[in-house]
Amino acid sequence: MGKMKFVICMVLFLNNCATLKIKLNPINQSNAESDDGSDEQVEKIWLEYFDILNNGELKDVLSFMKPSVIFTFNNQTIKTEDHDQLFLLLKQWKENQKKKDIYIKNHSISSGKVADDFITIVDVIQGEYSNKTNELIKEKRTFYYFHRLKIKGWKLYMITSAALENEL
């Protein structure tokens, strides 16, 4: 229970840091450059991850992620222990998307460094659309937390849902 409280506190802390940095950081304009390009680099990594997640092989998505990833959606936290468990979770997500007969479209992407060249958060607003009618079903906001590893580069280690500003 103590470990869960720590994880929740860290999620809230990092989320607040990222929100503040994203709002204050001038790099949020799409054509602006950051000091070393790491935010744009991480956004490109996220776009590649998202494309493979939706159109490619799920096993290829694992290369973008640490084996232990924390997912927090609707006040429920799931932590994977290894790539096998992570693969099963992603497979379940993809099957659920097929069952709902929806596709996901990106509405906006921005990023902010939480710790210079060490942790970056990508803030994504997406829409879920009906495959039959192409109508927007709902809009959602998700934070993707990336950690830079010395040898392996940027890896996704946490994904959390967030309320949209009009939902607050």
Regions found by a protein language model. Name each.
Residues A18-K59, S63:
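Short, low-complexity N-terminal intrinsically disordered segments enriched in polar/charged residues
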Residues L20-P26, K138-L168:
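Short beta-strand edge/turn micro-motifs at domain boundaries
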Residues F87-T133:
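Surface-exposed, charged secondary-structure patches
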Residues G2-C9:
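Sec-dependent signal peptide recognition
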Residues L47-D51, S63-I78:
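Short, solvent-exposed secondary-structure junction/capping segments
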Residues V11-C17:
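Hydrophobic h-region of N-terminal signal peptides that target proteins for export
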Residues L58-L62, P67, H83, F87:
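An amphipathic alpha-helix signature
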Residues M65, N75-T77, D123-Q126, T160:
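A mature extracytoplasmic/lumenal domain signature
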